[in-house]
Amino acid sequence: MDDEDGRCLLDVICDPQALNDFLHGSEKLDSDDLLDNPGEAQSAFYEGPGLHVQEASGNHLNPEPNQPAPSVDLDFLEDDILGSPATGGGGGGSGGADQPCDILQQSLQEANITEQTLEAEAELDLGPFQLPTLQPADGGAGPTGAGGAAAVAAGPQALFPGSTDLLGLQGPPTVLTHQALVPPQDVVNKALSVQPFLQPVGLGNVTLQPIPGLQGLPNGSPGGATAATLGLAPIQVVGQPVMALNTPTSQLLAKQVPVSGYLASAAGPSEPVTLASAGVSPQGAGLVIQKNLSAAVATTLNGNSVFGGAGAASAPTGTPSGQPLAVAPGLGSSPLVPAPNVILHRTPTPIQPKPAGVLPPKLYQLTPKPFAPAGATLTIQGEPGALPQQPKAPQNLTFMAAGKAGQNVVLSGFPAPALQANVFKQPPATTTGAAPPQPPGALSKPMSVHLLNQGSSIVIPAQHMLPGQNQFLLPGAPAVQLPQQLSALPANVGGQILAAAAPHTGGQLIANPILTNQNLAGPLSLGPVLAPHSGAHSAHILSAAPIQVGQPALFQMPVSLAAGSLPTQSQPAPAGPAATTVLQGVTLPPSAVAMLNTPDGLVQPATPAAATGEAAPVLTVQPAPQAPPAVSTPLPLGLQQPQAQQPPQAPTPQAAAPPQATTPQPSPGLASSPEKIVLGQPPSATPTAILTQDSLQMFLPQERSQQPLSAEGPHLSVPASVIVSAPPPAQDPAPATPVAKGAGLGPQAPDSQASPAPAPQIPAAAPLKGPGPSSSPSLPHQAPLGDSPHLPSPHPTRPPSRPPSRPQSVSRPPSEPPLHPCPPPQAPPTLPGIFVIQNQLGVPPPASNPAPTAPGPPQPPLRPQSQPPEGPLPPAPHLPPSSTSSAVASSSETSSRLPAPTPSDFQLQFPPSQGPHKSPTPPPTLHLVPEPAAPPPPPPRTFQMVTTPFPALPQPKALLERFHQVPSGIILQNKAGGAPAAPQTSTSLGPLTSPAASVLVSGQAPSGTPTAPSHAPAPAPMAATGLPPLLPAENKAFASNLPTLNVAKAASSGPGKPSGLQYESKLSGLKKPPTLQPSKEACFLEHLHKHQGSVLHPDYKTAFPSFEDALHRLLPYHVYQGALPSPSDYHKVDEEFETVSTQLLKRTQAMLNKYRLLLLEESRRVSPSAEMVMIDRMFIQEEKTTLALDKQLAKEKPDEYVSSSRSLGLPIAASSEGHRLPGHGPLSSSAPGASTQPPPHLPTKLVIRHGGAGGSPSVTWARASSSLSSSSSSSSAASSLDADEDGPMPSRNRPPIKTYEARSRIGLKLKIKQEAGLSKVVHNTALDPVHQPPPPPATLKVAEPPPRPPPPPPPTGQMNGTVDHPPPAAPERKPLGTAPHCPRLPLRKTYRENVGGPGAPEGTPAGRARGGSPAPLPAKVDEATSGLIRELAAVEDELYQRMLKGPPPEPAASAAQGTGDPDWEAPGLPPAKRRKSESPDVDQASFSSDSPQDDTLTEHLQSAIDSILNLQQAPGRTPAPSYPHAASAGTPASPPPLHRPEAYPPSSHNGGLGARTLTR
C-alpha cells in the first residue's frame, strides 16, 4: 500500500532498518533493538517510564522471544496483516509486505517468542509478576504515557515500547507485552505504522485470542500498540491501546479491539485481564473485558487501569505499588474487586487514522460491539479506588499516565489542547495526585485527551475524535456481571456501554451505550462508561464519552474529577469507603453529541447504586453535553477538569469544598470544556458533596460557556455534568453537600431559569460547602453561597449561568443523572440522592423523579410518588416547602435549606432514587421535556423510551432495560431535548442500584422552557433529597419549564420502597407530597407539559369510557390551539428563505471568486509565497518519496518509465501541443505524464520548463524524447518543464520530481519538480483523463501524459493532451492534429475532471471565464491552479507568456505553457470549442488542473483548491465544460482555441491548463 505520501511500505518492509526508518525515522529503535533490549527500547521510546521494571520483565520476556518459532497468534496476525503494508511497519522493519510471514516470524524470532516461550513466559511471569510486576512497571507506565510506553506499566510491556496497552499489569501481562512486543513490532508497527494503511487490518484482530488471553493478547495487541507507538511517531499513545490487564490467564481474549485493542480477560481473578484497546485505532478502542472476579483481579485491574501503563498507571497514579493502590485493593476495594478488570481502554492514536472500520471487536462476547462502536475509548476502571484511570490519550496524546499521580499531564496531540491541558492540569494538582486529565478543552481535535490522569483519577479519555470509539468497560462488581451486562449492552446501539448490571448492587455498569447511538450521532463518541461500583462505594465511572465527534473535547476533566473525586478520593479517600468515582466525561458536541451525552447520563443511573443504599454507587455521568450542543459545546469540553479536584474534599464536605472551589475555578476556565462532570460518591458525604458540587459546577461552567456567566454558564452548558454522588455519609455536612449538590442541580435548572435559581442554590450550597468553592467558577452566586455553604454558591452561580444556558440546561438534564446511589438507608446519606436529583438539568431530574410526571399529569403523580417516600419531601421537590433545605437549595428561597432539612432531604433522596426508578415518572418527564424541546416529537420518543424502562421495572431491571432502551431513548431525547430521557435513565439506574439512587435527571427540556420544567423536576428529587426546593425554584424560574416539578418524583418513593412501587405509583403519584406545591407558574407549566405529553403520546386505542375520560384525553389538545399556517405564511417563509439563500449564495460566490483571485495572484507570483514554501516543506517528504519511486521505476522498469514519458512527449508534433500539455504535464511533471498517462500512443513527451524560479515555464514536447520522457519522465518531465523551451530538454531529469498524492482527491497524484528552488508541477494525476488513472506510473506521470491522451475519456481528452497542444501546436506544432495525442497530459487533467482534468481546476473557473475571454482566463486559470501556485506560477507565467503572452507560469500553466507555445499561438480557437466539447471534462479538467497545480501546492493548498474547484465545478462545469477540455487541450485562452479543434482533449489538457490559467 502506498503511504499517503507515496512511499510504499512494501519498499521497506523487507528491510527492518528501512522499515523502521520509514515508520519512525532512523532515530527510532529497530524492532530488533526493541525486542532485544526492552530497556533500551523503552528508554528510547519512553524515556520517562520506569524502565527498571520493564527491564526485568523484558529480560524475562526476551529470553522467550529468543526462541525463533513464531507464535501461532502471530501467524494469524500475519494473515490479517499481510496484505497491508501497514503490517509491515512496525518498530522493527519486519519482513516486507512481500513476505509478511517472514516478517512476523522474524519479529518473533528476534524476540524469541514462540508458543513455548509464551507459555513459559506466562507461567513465569504470571506468578511472579502479578502484582509486583505492576509496581515496577508502573513507573514505566507513567512515562510511557508520553511514549505510549504506558505499556511499561508492566515491565514486560515496557519491553516493547510500542504497546502500552500491553501492559498487563502483572507479570503475565508483562508476558503479554513481550510477546506482543515482538509481534507488535510486526503487527503493531504494521498496523500502527501505517495505521492509516493498516487500519483496516485491525490489529485488534490480530490480537491473538490465545487462550492464554494474556499471551495471546499481548501478541496482537501489544503489537498493535507498539505499532501505534512506533508506527506513528506522532502518536506514541497508539501503543497504548493494548492494555493487558494482568490476568494471568486471561480467559478471554476478550474481544479484539476493533483495531488494535485487544482484550484479554482474566480467567482468574488474579489474572489480569488484558484489555487492550486498540491503540491503533482509536475507535477500536478496545474493550475491556474484565472478567476477573477476585480481588486479585482487582490487581489486574490496576494494571489495566493504567492506561498506558496500566498497572503502572495506577501506580503512577499515585501509588508506587503500581497497582493503583486503591485499585488493587481498591479494585477489590470493594465489591469492586470482583469486577476488577476494568480497564479497557483503548487508545486511539490520534493521529493515526483509525481504522474505523475495525471495530470488529471480537471482543469478548461481552462487549464486542459496544466498544467498537464508539471509537472512543473509555477507560473504565472497575475499581473505584483503583480507578486508576487508564488514561488514554485519545489520540495523539499520549497519555501520560504519569507514574506520578499528580503528574497527569495530558498530552494533547494538539498544541491548543495542550495548553488547555495545562490548565486543566492545575486542577489535578489540586486534586491530589489525581490530576484531572485535562481535556483538551476546546481542542478542536478530538485527540486531545487528556486524560491523564494517573491512575488516581479515572480518566476517561476522550474518545477520539473518531467518532467514536469509545469503549467503556465497566466491570460489574463481579466480573461475571460485567460480561452479562456487556452482553446486554451490546445490544444497545451504542452499545457502547456495558451496563453492568447484573447485580444491581455492586457496580452496575452503567455505561450507557446510549452512547453508541451517539456515536452514530457522530460526534458523539460518547461512550461513557460507568464503572459500576461494586461495593457501596466503589464507584466507577466513567461515563462519559465525549461525544464530540469532532471535538476531542473529551472530558478528561471528569476524569480528573473522577480522579479527584474518585481517584483522588480513592487515594486519599480510599479511606472513605465511597471511593466511588464517577467520571463523566462528556463531551458534548453541541449537537448530536450533546444528546448523546445525555444518554450518558441516563446510563449513569445505572449506577449501581447501591441497591444497598450505599451512596457510593453513584455514577454520575451525565450527558451534559446535550445542552452543550445548544450551547457551545466545545466549551464544556475542556473545562470540566476542575472537578477532579473535588475529590480532595472527600474528607469533609467543607474541607472538600475549598478544594472544590479551587477546582471549580479552574473549571470555569475550563468551563468551556464543560461537560464533563464527574461525580464521585465518596463514601463519605463530604467527598460526595464536593464532587457533586464540583461536577455541578463543571456543568455550570459548561453551560456557562454558553452563557456569559463565566463559571456557571459553562457548567451549565455542560449538561453532561453529572452530579451525583452522594455518599451515604451520615455526616451532616456530607448530607449538606449532597443537598447542595442537589441544590446545585436544582439551581442549575434555576440557573437556566435565572437568578431565582441562584438564590435557592445558595441555600443548598450551604449544606454543600464543598461545592461552593467549585461554584466559585460561577462567580456570581458563588460568593454568597460560598460563605455559608460552598456548595450553595456554586449552585447559585450555576443557576444564573444556567438561565442563559437554560436551553442548554434542558439538554443538560441528562447529565443530571445523578447517580445517586445515595444510600437510602441513611437519611443523611440521602444527600447522594440529592445529588442525583441534581439532575443538573432540571428537567432530567424530573424525569427521573416524579418529575417524570413532567408531563403535566405525570408530574403530579410524581409528586405524589415523592411524597410517598417522604410526604414532605415529595412536595419539597416540587416546592421548597417540602423540604426547607431542599427548597432553599432549589431556589434562593431554598436557601433556608439547611443541613437539618438536609437529613430529611436525604431521606427523601433515597426515595427519589426510587422515584427515578419509577418508570412512570420518568416517562412523563420525558414527555415533558420533549414538549418543551423544539423537537418535541423526538422527545416524546425519548420519553416513551424512557418510560418504558422506568416502568419496566424495579430498579435493577429497569436499569438494565433502561440501558438498553435508554440508548435509543437517550439518543432520542437528546435530540428532542431528550436530555430528560437520559436523565431518567440514569435515574432509573440509580434507583436500581439503590433506592436512593435517586433520580437521574431526566433529560432536560429541549427548549429552555422545557428545561425549566426539567429543572423543576430535578429540584423535586432534590427536594426529596433536599433538592425539592430547587425544584420549586426552578419551577419558578423556569416556570415555563414546568417540568421541573417532575423532579419531585424522585423523592417519591421511600428509599425503602422498591422502585417497583414507586414506579407504579409514579403515575398514580404514589404519594403526593402536598407539602411542596409548585408555584403557579410551575403548575401551569406542568399542566401544559402534561397536556403536551398527552398529545404527543396519545392513548388512541382505548374507547372513551366516559365523558370525563374523553374530556381528559381531548382537552390537552388545546395546546395545539391556533391557526394553521396560511399560504401567505408559507410564501413569506419561502421569500425569506430565498432571500437568505440568495445572499448566502452570493457570499459564497464572492468568497470563491476572491479565493480564485487570490489563487490567480498567487499563481502569478514569480517567487514562491510563504504559503507555497510551507506547502513545499510539507510535501517535501512526499516529493522525495515520489522521486525515489520515479528513480526506482526508471531503474527497474525503464520501459514503463519511458512509455509514460513518451506518452507525455509522444508526438513531437504534439510537442507544441505537448508543450502545452507538458506545460501542464511537466508542470506536474507527472501531469504531463498523467495527461499522457494514456501511454497509449503519445510517445511525445511534454516538457515543461521553468525559465526561472519564477520564470515562465516553457513546455516542450519531445517526440523523440519519449525515451527521455520515460527515463526523465518524471525527472525529465520536470526537466521538460525546465527545458520547456527545448523540446528535447525534457529528457534531462535534473530537477527532482516530487509526487504528491492528494488524499482528498482519490487517486490524484501530483508530481512536482523542484528547480531553482521552485517547484513545478510536472504531473498532475488530476489532469490525467479519468481512464488515465493508469498513468499510475505516477512517477512518470509527466512522461505519461501522452499515454494519457488515449485514455482521455473523449478522444478529445486524449487530444486534450495532444490536441491541447495541437491546437496551440497548430500554430506551433500540430497542436490540433496532435491534440489527440497531446491529450495525454491534458487528458490527465481532463480525465480527472472529465478528461479535462488538467485544466479542470483552473479550467473550470477558467473554462467558464475563458469562454468569454480566453486570454484573461489563463491567468485566472493559473490562479485556480494556485493550489500549485508555486509551480503553477512559474509555469503559468510561461503559459501566459505563451498563451496570453502573459508571464504567469503555472505548473498547470506549464501544460498551458506547453500549449502556450502552441496554445499561445492558437490560443483563441480551441478554447471556445473545447469548452463546448469539453464541457464535462472541463469540470474535471478544472479540478484536474487544480491538481497539477495542487501538486505543486501542498496537499493543503490542493485541498483548498479542490474544495473551491468542487464548488465551482457545478457552475464551472457548465461554462467550463468545453472550456476545460479546451483549456486542457489548449493553453489557456488562446490555446483553447487551438485545442478547440481537438478542442476536447486538447482543450482539456492544455486548454485545461490554459483555461485554468485564463480562468484563474
Curated annotation (Swiss-Prot):
Q: Where is the composition biased (Polar residues)?
A: 1227-1236, 1485-1515
Give the primary localization class.
nucleus
> Residue positions of the PTM Phosphoserine?
919, 1413
Where are residues bearing N6-acetyllysine located in the sequence? 1057
Q: Which residues carry this modification: Phosphothreonine?
A: 921
The biological process GO terms on file are: chromatin remodeling; negative regulation of cell differentiation; positive regulation of cell population proliferation; positive regulation of DNA-templated transcription; positive regulation of stem cell population maintenance; regulation of transcription by RNA polymerase II
Q: Bias category Low complexity: which stretches?
A: 624-664, 747-780, 881-896, 1005-1028, 1264-1281, 1401-1412
Q: Name one GO molecular function term.
A: transcription regulator activator activity
**What are the Pro residues biased-composition ranges?**
726-736, 791-806, 814-831, 843-880, 932-941, 1331-1356
> What's in the GO CC field?
chromatin; GBAF complex; nucleus; SWI/SNF complex
Q: Where is this cross-link: Glycyl lysine isopeptide (Lys-Gly) (interchain with G-Cter in SUMO2)?
A: 1313
Q: Keywords assigned by UniProt?
A: Acetylation, Disease variant, Intellectual disability, Isopeptide bond, Nucleus, Phosphoprotein, Ubl conjugation
Q: Where is this region: Disordered?
A: 53-99, 624-688, 723-949, 974-1028, 1049-1075, 1215-1300, 1324-1424, 1440-1560
Tissue localization of expression = Expressed at moderate levels in heart, brain, placenta, skeletal muscle, and pancreas, and at lower levels in lung, liver and kidney.
Q: Which InterPro entries did the record assign?
A: Chromatin_remod/trans_coact, GSCR1_dom
Gly residues composition bias: which ranges? 86-96
The compartments listed are:
Nucleus
> PANTHER family in the record, alphabetically?
BRD4-INTERACTING CHROMATIN-REMODELING COMPLEX-ASSOCIATED PROTEIN, GLIOMA TUMOR SUPPRESSOR CANDIDATE REGION GENE 1
**Main role?**
Component of SWI/SNF chromatin remodeling subcomplex GBAF that carries out key enzymatic activities, changing chromatin structure by altering DNA-histone contacts within a nucleosome in an ATP-dependent manner. May play a role in BRD4-mediated gene transcription.
- Could you give the subunit structure recorded for this chain? Component of the multiprotein chromatin-remodeling complexes SWI/SNF: SWI/SNF-A (BAF), SWI/SNF-B (PBAF) and related complexes. The canonical complex contains a catalytic subunit (either SMARCA4/BRG1/BAF190A or SMARCA2/BRM/BAF190B) and at least SMARCE1, ACTL6A/BAF53, SMARCC1/BAF155, SMARCC2/BAF170, and SMARCB1/SNF5/BAF47. Other subunits specific to each of the complexes may also be present permitting several possible combinations developmentally and tissue specific.
* Disorder cited: Coffin-Siris syndrome 12: A form of Coffin-Siris syndrome, a congenital multiple malformation syndrome with broad phenotypic and genetic variability. Cardinal features are intellectual disability, coarse facial features, hypertrichosis, and hypoplastic or absent fifth digit nails or phalanges. Additional features include malformations of the cardiac, gastrointestinal, genitourinary, and/or central nervous systems. Sucking/feeding difficulties, poor growth, ophthalmologic abnormalities, hearing impairment, and spinal anomalies are common findings.
Recorded protein name is BRD4-interacting chromatin-remodeling complex-associated protein
Give the organism the record lists: Homo sapiens (Human)
